[in-house]
C-alpha cells in the first residue's frame, strides 16, 4: 500500500518510496514494484502520469485520474507553473543561498536513447538552493579524520534529467547515495555508519493551481525512516516540520545502522 497524500475526483498524489519505478518500461519489463500499477489497484481506477521522479528519489508524485487531468497537469509542469521543493543531504558544508544557472548536456541512455540525437548542445538548467544546516561527525572518510554533511533545500526552475544531482555535483557537494554523480567513498561511509543506504533526495512539496477548480493546492510528503534517522543522528530534527513524522522506527544497530 502506498501512502496517498491527496485525492479528489480529478487528481491523486502519493508518497513514492525510494527504489520504486513510476511505471514500467521495456527496459524493466519484469519489475514487479511499480507505482502506477500499485495506485491503480489501490484506488480501483486508472491513473495518468504528469511527471516523473527518478527511481531512487522519494516524495510527492502527482497523477491525473483521467487522460485530460494528466494532460493538464503535464502542461503545467512543462510550462514551469508548478513549484517543486526538494531536500537533500550532501557532502560537505553547503551554507549559502543562491541560484545556480548551469546548462547541462542531455544524458543519454545507451539502450533507451540509442536513436536520440547526440549533437544537442547544453540545455538551460536553473536551480535555487539554500543551505539549512551542517554537521561534522567523528567518522573518518578517505584522508579526512571527520565527515561533514549538509542539509539543503532545492527548487529546480527547469526539469533536466538528473538536474539536482548534477548541479550539486557541479558545486562539489554531491548528494549522499548518488552512485552515478556522487562520491563513492562518502556513499559507503554514510551507509556503513549512519544507515544512509539510499539516494538522500526527497521531493518534499508540490505547489500548483488546481487545473479544474482553480484553487491553490500544496502537497507535502513525509520522510521515510532512513531520513528521520539521519535527522536525529545529525541533530536536525525540527528543521523540516512539514515533512517530519512523529513516529518512526528507531535505529537498532550500532553507528546508526539498521538491523536486517
Curated annotation (Swiss-Prot):
InterPro entries: PsdUridine_synth_cat_dom_sf (IPR020103), PsdUridine_synth_RluA-like_CS (IPR006224), PsdUridine_synth_RsuA/RluA (IPR006145), RluA_PseudoU_synthase (IPR050188). It catalyses: uridine(65) in tRNA = pseudouridine(65) in tRNA. Gene3D superfamilies: Pseudouridine synthase. It holds the Pfam family PseudoU_synth_2. Its EC number is 5.4.99.26. The active site is at 54. GO terms for molecular function: RNA binding; tRNA pseudouridine(65) synthase activity. Keywords: Isomerase, tRNA processing. One of its GO terms (biological process) is enzyme-directed rRNA pseudouridine synthesis. It is an enzyme of class 5 (isomerase). Responsible for synthesis of pseudouridine from uracil-65 in transfer RNAs. NCBIfam families: PRK11112.1. Belongs to the pseudouridine synthase RluA family. This is tRNA pseudouridine synthase C. It comes from Escherichia coli O157:H7. The lineage of its organism: Bacteria, Pseudomonadati, Pseudomonadota, Gammaproteobacteria, Enterobacterales.
Amino acid at each position: 500500500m502506498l501512502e496517498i497524500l491527496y485525492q479528489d475526483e480529478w487528481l491523486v498524489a502519493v508518497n513514492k518510496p525510494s527504489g520504486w519505478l513510476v511505471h514500467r518500461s521495456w527496459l524493466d519489463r519484469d519489475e514487479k514494484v511499480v507505482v502506477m500499477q500499485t495506485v491503480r489497484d489501490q484506488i480501483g481506477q486508472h491513473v495518468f502520469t504528469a511527471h516523473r521522479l527518478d527511481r531512487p528519489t522519494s516524495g510527492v508524485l502527482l497523477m491525473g485520474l483521467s487522460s485530460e487531468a494528466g494532460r493538464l497537469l503535464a502542461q503545467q509542469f512543462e510550462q514551469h507553473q508548478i513549484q517543486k521543493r526538494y531536500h537533500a543531504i550532501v557532502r560537505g558544508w553547503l551554507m549559502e543561498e543562491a541560484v545556480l544557472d548551469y546548462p547541462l548536456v542531455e544524458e543519454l541512455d545507451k539502450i533507451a536513447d540509442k536513436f536520440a540525437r547526440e549533437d544537442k548542445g547544453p540545455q538551460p538548467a536553473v536551480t535555487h538552493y539554500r543551505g539549512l544546516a551542517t554537521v561534522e561527525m567523528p567518522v573518518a572518510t578517505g584522508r579526512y579524520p571527520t565527515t561533514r554533511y549538509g542539509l539543503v533545500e532545492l527548487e529546480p526552475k527547469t526539469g533536466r534529467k538528473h538536474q539536482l544531482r548534477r548541479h550539486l555535483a557541479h558545486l562539489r557537494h554531491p548528494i549522499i547515495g548518488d552512485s552515478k554523480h556522487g562520491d563513492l567513498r562518502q556513499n559507503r561511509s554514510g551507509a556503513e555508519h549512519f544507515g544512509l543506504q539510499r539516494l538522500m533526495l526527497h521531493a518534499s512539496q508540490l505547489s500548483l493551481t488546481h487545473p479544474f477548480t482553480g484553487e491553490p493546492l500544496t502537497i507535502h510528503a513525509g520522510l521515510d525512516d532512513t531520513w528521520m534517522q539521519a535527522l536525529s543522528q545529525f541533530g536536525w530534527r525540527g528543521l523540516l516540520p512539514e515533512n517530519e513524522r512523529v513516529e518512526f522506527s528507531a535505529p537498532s544497530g550500532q553507528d546508526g545502522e539498521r538491523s536486517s
